[in-house]
């Protein structure tokens, strides 16, 4: 196998047994693809597909005026260019967006002509606001902050059948219901009541009998009965009736008389119940008719109107129960045929018929009026209004849309074969739904499971943005309709008709403040990827936390391979927010799909199919770990499979599909936990959640025991620099990498140069530090998509969230009681868990009523010492080390003129003293902060003079840009002359540039000429002359292009910044704060084993082994058994082996052993102990040495989830590393030097420092701000609040009888205003006494009682 640039430098020993059938897909595809589809940027007019923006425009346009004389049509749209790139947008605090220009056509019709002749057409491009662009990493920059739009898992549109689980009625009877959910529009519900009548609700309003809706659709009673029932036909034969016999219908009835066959043999005796056997005999006998007495039809319901044959008079209405009176009329009138409804109590209930009986309406108009009254109570109904309302509800494309998904789900559920159709409902749809509902009530068919992933779909960014955009367009439509009527008379253009504000506002609101638009979690690369792969059931149109029950949150069998069963937050959102599984993707309808290998006749093929939850139900799916032979045939007699959402076993011949990988079940975060299969699910959940909170350490350290997913996460997260094209590294320094692109990847006419600017020490959303470090050296060859620079938390292109620590599991002096962690001082000395945090502090100079605020170094009443870190403009120097209270930006604000005394006036007149007009409002370093200034940005309003600092910052930025462009030109020029040299050497010159005719051109000749002289050469061959001309033109062209680029950047930098109204200048100061690990910080492993650092011990006191190597961390062994996360123990053992092997390699290198010996040892590690074979023979000797040097600190291992290292392999590795196979060692106490009683498990575990740092939580207050009403101190660090002394604490003091302490707590330390001021003054005077007074809360209590109208007073004597 071919190794990439970074892979060959450090190969991971992989323990997986199963072959890689399919690579893990690009992890951010769900975001990028969705938004690309929405924008369809770069598509021409004919290429536009009916999705995204295009679909939104087409659904709202054309807009036709009320009179119908003018129309506005949509032609197409185009997106402009963004004003600033992503980095500039973040700095300036603006949105990264492009202008949207829409081409519309205004058509004015001729009023006079009868056939609507066109009078005038105007076409114009209209600006429709800005559309935010997605960055290449799937985020949006909104007002300068990176945000992510989380995908939503919502109920798919379509029709759903359900029952109330017996909860509505006291009898526990199941009440069935059906609900038609459109993509937009009114919901339609059908439901049974306890008396078995069917009702309908529109938009969850008051219920009406379902027959009202059918009547409103234009069905008569007879048509309704015809649709839902079959009929029994009776012929009247004098006193008796003859029934047209369908034997099946008699089943379960009691025979009213003997039933005889043709020969007179009795088949069923009178009074006997008719069974299936009897029915078989009847069918055999071929009896077509059955004589029954007249009263047999008593109580049955008529299916058709019964009419007097002679007079035409109606004897019985349709759907009437037959009684003796009607039967007498029938006999008298000599009616020959009666049709009754066939119903029974088992599988054909009289529900629709009963519903018709309770329905008060009798024709279509009455039904429409009834619906109008329900929808608009209190309004007088008219025929037109009722008809319009009803048509608009379900039959108008403007108001109702099922969407393609909805129509597909609808048709599938009611058993139609076609999956396409109209977006609105039709009569047949509604009848079909009712029929299905009645069938389910009759016991045919089953209800739906709403938590099945075939009934829930994912709405991604693009779709949600499109919906918001449509909302904005609909608002515009109303305004345009009104203006269209004026368009003709006033000769308006399309631009005058359309106001883009509502559209822009709708889009801005969605990206800025929607519940699903979340502030990007930038703790580390994993947290970014996880947020982008989230699916949330919350949000607009979704569930709410309070209403979501247990079922919705639970793991469902269809989650397999689509949604991770492990990763979900703890707390109120559990199960509502999920993560996509590693291989999952969405299909065209938005349902989640998972990949499977096709299996035919027990043979596993290479073909891979993606199936949604609905499609996979009928398949028999084997697990990825099913045993196969070399011919890829399943060899077990019975294979463990999933079928119909159940786990079972089947023969290999029955298997139709097979999983592609064992990790397709879990999400990215869970697949980073080694030995996940040995951890309890609850702890694995904590483990995957805590990896997201790991803070990037100063020096990233790859995990010794990983899972092989680390590289994918680092590559796809976008924090690393990945080569866009292959080539050779031309130059590299800390801030940029320049690649000369390989010739075969250069497109014609463009410079073969890629310049990658690295991000240096910038602030992330979580105030952690983002910094990239190059991995390549000058002259290295890189291929496309090789990793060239590491980002935060990545080490040689692998995710590295924490540090490998030598740990021992032992209880030690109570320092690790209750999950506490005992650390060695060495960890602090080596800066293993030191992190850098970057804080942004902002100073804003505004225009006030009394005059402008000024940023200056001239601050009143501030000593010289406080100003020594500021430059002449009053802004702190970069590189200054500052502490709490230091001035960062000097700023003075004018204050109102105070009345001056005559003496002051005199001094003013003499000295011109102005200092008292302004007060000092400088930006100071907040309390508890100490750090180094690493960057300063100054933004100045247009028209305000820029200070020296702003100009110097601008100059340095321009120098950087110029340097970049010069570099690009240098390489282009060099490459061009190289090509010319290879073309010219050995050819003959005609003259020019001081050469003689016929002189041969050699390298020496060319070296003797300046580059400019080359173009003066005249060659014998015309083709060469042409090449020279082209080269000259190309170089001149490039130079001009780069100069234009420079001017453009310069113009951008020099134009004023767009600041908020009233703001003159903004100065942003960035502080880098270095935080070492200290007691109180939270740490964790990857298995949910979290704890707080309790004590940092000197190295010499820590337990050490026989060689004197001390451990770094001592963990409590009691944290393992009850939590059942044994994965951490296995990780520790394998970590020990990895480290031991690294030490062996290190010794070999130090002894300068031959490369062949190294190769042999590496081969033993990689290829002789289980797992995947590595092709070390492909590496050159130098590469092997390089590899060995990188393995000195330990051989990294990969143990993929559910396919990891076995116990035997771990032992073999320990043996190879010359370590005890038990993984346990004899330790000695560093304090006493005594042996511990028994051997202790020692090894290497990957530990993370989580973003819950004691520095951010610790805080102290003596005095500060107080609450307005109660006058008690505020709470919380943000408000600089106090410690709460609550009700129970008061009880404790009462119980101890500590009266004075209690009095102090309730008065001077809390809300006795006079007492506390007095006490403060006393302390200042050195007089330590207090006089408690009346607490303010008492006054509040009195006021509250008075507000109830009770007069209450405090009697003082």
From Swiss-Prot:
GO CC annotations, alphabetized: DNA-directed RNA polymerase complex
HAMAP family tied to this protein: RNApol_bact_RpoB
Keyword Cell cycle: no
Catalytic activity, as annotated: RNA(n) + a ribonucleoside 5'-triphosphate = RNA(n+1) + diphosphate
Main EC class the enzyme belongs to: transferase
Keywords: DNA-directed RNA polymerase, Nucleotidyltransferase, Transcription, Transferase
InterPro entries, A to Z: DNA-dir_RNA_pol_bsu_ext_1_sf, DNA-dir_RNA_pol_bsu_external_1, DNA-dir_RNA_pol_su2, DNA-dir_RNAP_su2_dom, DNA-dir_RNAP_su2_hyb_sf, RNA_pol_bsu_bac, RNA_pol_bsu_CS, RNA_pol_bsu_protrusion
CDD domains: RNA_pol_B_RPB2
Name of the protein in its database record: DNA-directed RNA polymerase subunit beta
